[in-house]
Curated annotation (Swiss-Prot):
Cofactor annotation comment: Binds 2 heme b groups non-covalently.
Organism this protein belongs to: Aquarana catesbeiana (American bullfrog)
PROSITE patterns in UniProt: CYTB_CTER, CYTB_NTER
InterPro entries registered for this protein in UniProt: Cyt_b/b6_C (IPR005798), Cyt_b/b6_C_sf (IPR036150), Cyt_b/b6_N (IPR005797), Cytb/b6-like_sf (IPR027387), Cytochrome_b (IPR030689), Cytochrome_b_C_euk/bac (IPR048260), Cytochrome_b_N_euk/bac (IPR048259), Di-haem_cyt_TM (IPR016174)
Name the UniProt record assigns to this protein: Cytochrome b
Residues given in the record as heme b b562 binding sites: H84, H183
Length: 380
């Protein structure tokens, strides 16, 4: 019998092993869709971004008007711009659900896959930050100034580092040009890192909701999960299209419709909604260096998850006490997101400090101690 081409061709057999004949646990459900949704988001962002880059001008005197030109004069430019801006929000919605699922079902015990995933999160955040500067509106300019200025908190090299990133003594033309360069190249680095992420995942196979070994009960990825993922694509792309056409500016900041002016500070400088939880943690510490370290640690704490897992059970499905504190962490992160969007005054600062303390308390102390407690209660 002639060999099947998808199993014998050097290139097709890699695709076949990753997306067609891949043995997958039979009990995966909707929470496992978000990895593929992130792939769709990345492709959508690269495609819309390439078309926008054809018409965008990375110059302080032309950037804002080039965005207006895209929206007014370019054929379907308004749609491209709205899809790209709101696509970033959907990207972060999917990435946070993906991380949440990993925390809930113990996916972080696949250490290499998890660590590459956290690096990917940093890359996506960096891409979103430099991208937000490109329209050169008020919030773009002041957001770039405030966030890059945080690097001056680094001992000895801080002020030199900031000027090196700015390309001068303030956020100006050189800054915008290099930020555009980074925004263009980073998605391709993310795509390469995503392939490494998948490579490590396929070494171990996917986890499943029970956290048990699923080698006895596996099905091929296609057609079962490929169609399930396709259903997710339709829902997400439908939601993205609806938001981009009916309420395109819902998640944006009104200040960004004003051209950047270094002489006028906006009344309340804040990043996009997906960074607000980290911004609230940064703002909750009065010391500049302490705030920057807390900001970094709020994401880097994810690297510790495989180390601080003390439970003999993998998934939270069978851990009622730890499950309660997982949802407390989700609620706490939602409170931090709300606080990050509020003015820097009481009672918001106090609430932010309490929520920031709880955030680190859950990660650093409660997760390992609850694992040990449950082992003792279950006598395992």
């Amino acid at each position: 019998m002639a060999p099947t081409m998808r199993k014998s061709h050097p290139l097709l057999k890699i695709i076949n092993g990753s997306f067609i004949d891949l043995p997958s646990p039979a009990n995966l459900w909707a929470w496992w869709n978000f990895g593929s949704l992130l792939g769709v988001c990345l492709v959508a962002q690269i495609v819309t971004g390439l078309f926008l880059a054809m018409h965008y001008t990375a110059d302080t005197s032309l950037a804002f008007s080039s965005i207006a030109h895209i929206c007014r004069d370019v054929n379907n430019g308004w749609l491209l711009r709205n899809l790209h801006a709101n696509g970033a929000s959907f990207f972060f919605i999917c990435i946070y659900f993906h991380i949440g699922r990993g925390l809930y079902y113990g996916s972080y015990l696949y250490k290499e896959t998890w660590n590459i995933g956290v690096i990917l999160l940093f890359l996506v955040m960096a891409t979103a930050f430099v991208g937000y500067v490109l329209p050169w509106g008020q919030m773009s300019f002041w957001g770039a100034t405030v966030i890059t200025n945080l690097l001056s908190a680094a001992p000895y090299i801080g002020s030199d580092l900031v000027q090196w990133i700015w390309g001068g003594f303030s956020v100006d033309n050189a800054t915008l040009t290099r930020f555009f360069t980074f925004h263009f190249i980073l998605p391709f680095i993310i795509a390469a890192a995503s392939m490494i992420h998948l490579l490590f995942l396929h070494q171990t196979g996917s986890s499943n909701p029970t956290g048990l070994n699923s080698n006895l009960d596996k099905v091929s990825f296609h057609p079962y999960f490929s169609y399930k993922d396709l259903f997710g694509f339709v829902i997400m792309l439908g939601a993205l299209a609806s938001l981009s056409t009916f309420a395109p500016n819902l998640l944006g900041d009104p200040d960004n419709f004003t051209p950047a002016n270094p002489l006028v500070t906006p009344p309340h400088i804040k990043p996009e909604w997906y960074f607000l939880f980290a911004y609230a943690i940064l703002r909750s510490i009065p010391n500049k260096l302490g705030g920057v370290l807390a900001l970094l640690l709020s994401i880097m704490v994810l690297f510790r998850m495989p180390i601080i897992h003390t439970s003999k059970l993998r998934s939270l499905m069978f851990r009622p006490i730890a499950k309660t504190f997982f949802w407390a962490l989700i609620a706490n992160t939602a409170i931090l997101t709300w606080i990050g969007g509020q003015p820097g005054e009481d009672p918001f600062i106090t609430i932010g400090q309490i929520a920031s303390g709880l955030y680190f308390l859950i990660f650093v102390l409660l997760i390992p101690s609850l694992g040990l407690l449950e082992n003792k209660l279950l006598k395992i």
